[in-house]
Amino acid sequence: MIETYSQPSPRSVATGLPASMKIFMYLLTVFLITQMIGSVLFAVYLHRRLDKVEEEVNLHEDFVFIKKLKRCNKGEGSLSLLNCEEMRRQFEDLVKDITLNKEEKKENSFEMQRGDEDPQIAAHVVSEANSNAASVLQWAKKGYYTMKSNLVMLENGKQLTVKREGLYYVYTQVTFCSNREPSSQRPFIVGLWLKPSSGSERILLKAANTHSSSQLCEQQSVHLGGVFELQAGASVFVNVTEASQVIHRVGFSSFGLLKL
């Protein structure tokens, strides 16, 4: 009789954790994360609560101080004269500090506003007779003249030069005698010219007026004015065709500009 023997198959080794262990680890992880979040929230709450309590304590101390100060002024309570004097001194120092801080803030704000504002730039000059009878009119700082800032200057008595760029209102008024010979038909022309810091001169405004045939001096005025953007170092001047006809009395002929 032949007996057969079969060797039992080896037991399979478990490669993963049991299901109960996985559930335990998952719950432990959730618990730790929840505890960390709760700790952070509690710390934030505690910090804010402590700040609020500290503020309330300070307010309470201020209230007690003011209440004691009132008692000192009324002569009530058991506070000694020395304590009252000390409290009054502290209160006066506090008021003085608050007043000084307000004044410093006002001064700083005023200085900042002054620094932000553009300085006023304005000029107004009157005509002056020129023996050379040149076509470019001469001007002078006399009579009712204005030279508001050192950022504008009258150069060579002929042109106004600005040292800061910006928009300017430039104007001129020229009064002249309109009597001419009947045979001459040439009008009296006034031109407002720009001389940039670099480049050639160019005309900004021009106006013309006809002459009369009268032998008497019939006064006529030409007014020019406009807004122009001038660069730093630019100059403006006035040119006429007959400088000998210009009237130079006060108030008749003038020239100026104003920064907008």
UniProtKB/Swiss-Prot annotation:
Cell compartments where the protein resides: Cell membrane; Cell surface
SUPFAM superfamilies in the cross-refs: TNF-like
Residue span, THD domain: 121-260
Tissue expression from the record: Specifically expressed on activated CD4+ T-lymphocytes.
Pfam family, one: TNF
Disulfide bridge partners, by residue number: 177-217
Keyword Transmembrane among UniProt keywords: yes
Transmembrane segments: 23-46
Cytoplasmic side: 1-22
Post-translational modification note: The soluble form derives from the membrane form by proteolytic processing.
Domain of life: Eukaryota
UniProt main location, coarse: membrane
PROSITE patterns reported for this sequence: THD_1, THD_2
An annotated Gene Ontology molecular function: CD40 receptor binding
Function: Cytokine that acts as a ligand to CD40/TNFRSF5. Costimulates T-cell proliferation and cytokine production. Its cross-linking on T-cells generates a costimulatory signal which enhances the production of IL4 and IL10 in conjunction with the TCR/CD3 ligation and CD28 costimulation. Induces the activation of NF-kappa-B. Induces the activation of kinases MAPK8 and PAK2 in T-cells. Mediates B-cell proliferation in the absence of co-stimulus as well as IgE production in the presence of IL4. Involved in immunoglobulin class switching.
Quaternary structure and partners: Homotrimer. Interacts with CD28. CD40 ligand, soluble form: Exists as either a monomer or a homotrimer. Forms a ternary complex between CD40 and integrins for CD40-CD40LG signaling.
PANTHER family in UniProt: CD40 LIGAND (PTHR11471:SF5), TUMOR NECROSIS FACTOR FAMILY MEMBER (PTHR11471)
Name listed for the protein in its UniProt record: CD40 ligand
Classification of source organism: Eukaryota, Metazoa, Chordata, Craniata, Vertebrata
